[in-house]
Swiss-Prot record:
It is an enzyme of class 6 (ligase). This is Valine--tRNA ligase. The keyword Aminoacyl-tRNA synthetase applies. Catalyzes the attachment of valine to tRNA(Val). As ValRS can inadvertently accommodate and process structurally similar amino acids such as threonine, to avoid such errors, it has a 'posttransfer' editing activity that hydrolyzes mischarged Thr-tRNA(Val) in a tRNA-dependent manner. It is found in: Cytoplasm. One of its GO terms (cellular component) is cytosol. Monomer. InterPro entries: aa-tRNA-synth_I_CS (IPR001412), aa-tRNA-synth_Ia (IPR002300), Anticodon_Ia_Val (IPR033705), M/V/L/I-tRNA-synth_anticd-bd (IPR013155), Rossmann-like_a/b/a_fold (IPR014729), tRNA-bd_arm (IPR010978), tRNAsynth_Ia_anticodon-bd (IPR009080), Val-tRNA_synth_C_sf (IPR037118). Belongs to the class-I aminoacyl-tRNA synthetase family. ValS type 1 subfamily. It catalyses: tRNA(Val) + L-valine + ATP = L-valyl-tRNA(Val) + AMP + diphosphate. One of its GO terms (molecular function) is valine-tRNA ligase activity.
């Protein structure tokens, strides 16, 4: 195969991805090797690739490809999530565009539309991941609502219900008035809002003086649900209200004044309106004091008949209207600007409504007790470890999980209501009928007598089983696959779903497998733009990942992402990083073409080449060991940088320059073969990060057989490093740098040979052949005193000199040195003048004076050196 003169990703990426697929190199089956298992965080089935997915899946692919090359049986399982709220909202919007309301359809009719939508739009994101180079076992692709996963979810619900861990009851829940469903606490995001604090007057019933009790509230629209006023019994300013009753403004309902030390004496007036149906804390007070509960809201956030006033109006419109009406009635004392935190639905971004509702809940304390210790004792490791505290805090304050959703798209709750009240829970309708007959003692009950619960389960109730259900470990608990692949190895995810998903998977793992679901969790950061802003459609600062791949190539984009992606820290993404990645691709390509372009001859290996190969062998070993260590610590960005520097700095800038034959001359066979071996190992180190270009070049190093691939080669890079050679060569680099600086300063062409004198013992004599070649030297000799008129430099404690003789124009050089001397002497005088100024010395900070003294010492040193050089030239 001929290698193109320029690297064009489009010619390479599709070709090799198809080759990997055709040869089933991504597929995994249980065997005798150590398994390495990763399950993809399932993206929404109708989603498209964004920068967060790019980062997350690049990291997963790097880990998976590295594991394959370490000889492990790597299994990366892809899949998608049915995303109840998001998908149902999209289907509802699509139907609305056709003039169809969800309420016009039966459940089955709506689900036909939802499945059609899913089949049309679903799976796009997984196809897009292929462009990135994701080496998933595509034959294992799963969907949270496919048959196997659905059976698992229903089986788990029934099991937990039978264990007494799932219950049904009326509780205060977070209600989403747009999605028309309950949400779990974790699906509520609290935002700071610039609100108002309304001071409302509640007349005291039967008060001869006509006094008012004043209540401060941010929600005057809920007064129609007030059933009590509460004061703190220890509040001196409200003692007069004890035992009284007050009248709700506008509503004219008489309600009691109750006492509880829950009330904050300092907030507002110290009087609290109690609305048990619409506030979590009020609900608890209502339970404690047996207060009536009046639900004044419809599910869509409009006021219900129970409100009595403003019926059918939206809650926020009522807030504006009631302010005017209270003002007109003389029942609004004042309004203040107020900043408070308001809960919003994570999915619809609508303010949630605390609402009493009949829902299904999962008791969480049992799970929290199992899931906390393994993380805190590092049996299951978090990277970075700082997230352990976030996890601990949530588990120690856990509340029961509201698992029911008032949606149709999802796993329908397997509860069946009986004609005379009550219900049964079963995996199938047939089992439910049998249970119903047993429970009622009525053997004549038929299927049509039972009504299945209309609600579906929270999406996370299916994805918490993901590491188990992907290997059918719920339906068939001891099958070969679950026993081999579980627990999985690494989970790569964002910290934003640590509660939604990570913690719950750990709980499910211990409940159903008695073991952790994964050994390590790598938390990625949030992808931000270069100004530090979170990427979003509204800001228009989120690039299209596929456009980036078209422009820079998948390897360029992968490298750009990883250069900016330290574990757990937010990444500041800039297209320039992808450009750096593309430039590195070109560097690798050009280096390979250079090596493959050399003529090879069966000649003796020069000493400089032998030294070069010996040195680079140690550099390669040292970096391979460093990279292995960094992978072990999940510091992938640093691992990439280590390989990048090895290739760019050590291999390209130094090694290839050392061994490069003279123009028109061949390279010896031994050095050439060694160099190809180095290239082979460099490609192995780079492959997990940059799979496409490395595969293309690896296929060109030697003739390969059909089906062979770099991605399944074993790393096997020796890690024994000769530290003495490595350290010595760092000195050699400085010596070569010193010689090149003199050439540059004195304007001496590279073709002019130079002599190098080493004053005293030469610490790098071993590398004389390398220095001679790279610096075009005629000789290197150790001397007691350097020649007059030499240019010299220090490396460590050793002085190196180059006799300049006829190589420079003495008059020009003298003029240059004398001009420099004049400048330095003038500079020294200005510093001394400052230091002799007593006012300056007494008032200036110590660090400023130290800086001036350093300037003095530096100038004096330069002056001495310049005078020495001038004297030498005048001899």
């Amino acid at each position: 195969m001929e290698l193109a003169s320029k690297y064009n990703p489009a010619d390479v990426e599709g070709k090799w991805y198809q080759y990997w697929l055709d040869n089933k190199l991504f597929s995994s089956k249980p065997d005798g090797r150590e398994p390495y298992t990763v399950v993809i965080p399932p993206p929404n089935v109708t989603g498209v690739l964004h920068m967060g997915h790019m980062l997350n899946n690049t990291i997963q692919d790097i880990l998976v490809r590295r594991a394959r090359m370490e000889g492990k049986n790597a299994c990366w399982v892809p899949g998608t999530d049915h995303a109840s709220i998001a998908t149902e909202a999209k289907v509802v919007n699509k139907l609305a565009g056709q003039g169809i309301k969800k309420t016009d359809l039966s459940r089955d009719e709506f689900l036909k539309h939802a499945w059609a939508w899913t089949e049309e739009h679903g799976g796009i994101i997984l196809k897009q991941l292929r462009k990135l180079g994701a080496s998933c076992d595509w034959d294992r692709t799963a969907f949270t609502m496919d048959e196997e996963r659905s059976e698992s979810v229903i089986k788990v619900f029934v099991d937990l219900y039978n264990k007494g861990l799932i219950y049904r009851g009326v509780r205060m829940v977070n209600w989403d008035p747009k999605a028309l469903t309950a949400l779990s606490d974790e699906e509520v995001i609290y935002k700071e809002e610039h609100s108002k604090l309304y001071y409302l007057r509640y007349k005291v019933e039967g008060d001869a003086e006509g006094r008012y009790a004043v209540v401060a509230t941010t929600r005057p629209e809920t007064i129609m649900g007030d059933t009590a006023m509460c004061i703190n019994p220890n509040d001196p300013k409200n003692q007069w209200l004890k035992g009284k009753k007050v009248i709700v403004p506008l509503v004219n309902r008489i309600i009691p004044v109750i006492e509880d030390d829950y009330v904050d004496i300092e907030f507002g007036t110290g009087c609290l309106k109690v609305t048990p149906a619409h506030d979590v804390n009020d609900y608890m007070l209502g339970e404690k004091y047996n207060l009536p509960s009046i639900d004044i809201f419809n599910d869509n956030g409009t006021l219900s008949e129970a409100a009595g006033l403003y019926v059918g109006m939206d809650r926020f419109d009522v807030r504006k209207q009631i302010e005017q009406d209270l003002q007109a009635a003389g029942l609004l004392e004042k309004v203040e600007a107020y900043t408070n935190k308001v809960g919003f639905s994570e999915r619809t971004n609508v303010a949630i409504e605390p609402k009493l509702s009949m829902q299904w809940f999962l008791k969480m304390q049992h799970f929290a007790d199992m899931a906390l210790p393994p993380v805190m004792n590092d049996e299951l490791k978090f990277y970075p470890a700082k997230y352990k505290n976030t996890y601990k805090n949530w588990l120690e304050n856990i509340k029961d999980w509201c698992i029911s959703r008032q949606l149709w798209w999802g796993h329908r709750i397997p509860a069946y209501f009986l004609p005379e009240g009550g219900y049964v829970v079963a995996e199938t309708a047939e089992e439910a009928l049998k249970l119903a007959q047993e429970k009622t003692g009525n053997t004549n009950l038929k299927m049509e007598d039972l009504r299945q619960d209309d609600d579906c389960l929270d999406t996370w109730f299916s994805s918490w089983l993901w590491p188990i259900s992907l290997f059918n470990g719920i339906n068939n608990p001891n099958n070969e696959e679950i026993n081999y692949y579980y627990p999985t190895s690494d989970l790569v995810t964002g910290p934003d779903i640590i509660f939604f998903w990570v913690a719950r998977m750990i709980m499910a793992g211990y409940e159903y497998k008695g073991d952790m679901p994964f050994k390590n969790v790598y938390f990625t950061g949030i992808v931000r733009d270069k100004l530090g802003r979170k990427m979003s459609k509204s800001l228009g600062n989120s690039p299209d990942p596929l456009e980036l791949i078209d422009k820079y190539g998948a390897d360029g984009v992968r490298m750009g992402m990883m250069l900016a992606a330290p574990a757990g820290n937010d990444i500041l993404f800039d297209d320039a990083l992808c450009e750096q990645g593309r430039n590195f691709n070109n560097k690798i390509w050009n280096a390979f073409r250079l090596v493959k372009g050399w003529e090879v001859a069966d000649i003796a290996q020069p000493e400089y080449a032998r030294l070069a190969t010996e040195w680079f062998e140690s550099m390669l070993a040292k970096t391979a060991a460093e990279v292995a260590d960094l992978f072990g610590k999940y510091r992938l960005s640093e691992a990439l940088m280590a390989v990048y520097k090895l290739f760019w700095d050590e291999f390209s800038s130094w090694y290839l320059e050392m061994i490069k034959p003279a123009y028109g001359q061949p390279i010896d066979k031994a050095t050439y073969e060694k160099t190809l071996g180095f290239f082979d190992n460099l490609l192995k180190l780079l492959h997990p990060f940059m799979p496409f270009i490395t595969e293309e070049l690896w296929q060109h190093i030697y003739d390969r057989k059909e089906g062979e691939s770099l991605m399944v080669q074993q790393l096997n890079i020796p890690t024994a490093c000769n530290e003495i050679i490595v350290k010595e060569f760092e000195v050699v680099k400085e010596v070569i740098g010193g010689i090149r600086t003199i050439r540059l300063q004195k304007n001496i062409a590279q073709k002019e040979t130079l002599e190098l004198q080493v004053v005293g013992v030469n610490p790098v004599a071993t590398f004389n052949p390398v220095i001679t070649k790279l610096c075009n030297l005629s000789s290197i000799e150790a001397v007691e005193n350097k020649a007059d008129g030499s240019g010299s430099f220090m490396v460590g404690t050793t002085e190196y000199a180059i006799p300049l003789g006829n190589l420079i124009n003495t008059e020009e050089e003298l003029a240059k040195l004398e001009a420099d001397l004049k400048y330095q002497e003038g500079f020294l005088q200005s510093v001394l003048k400052k230091l002799s100024n007593e006012k300056f010395v007494s008032k200036a900070p110590a660090n400023v004076i130290d800086m001036e003294r350093k300037k003095q010492a530096d100038a004096e040193s330069k002056i001495a050196s310049l005078k020495e050089s001038i004297a030498a030239l005048k001899k």
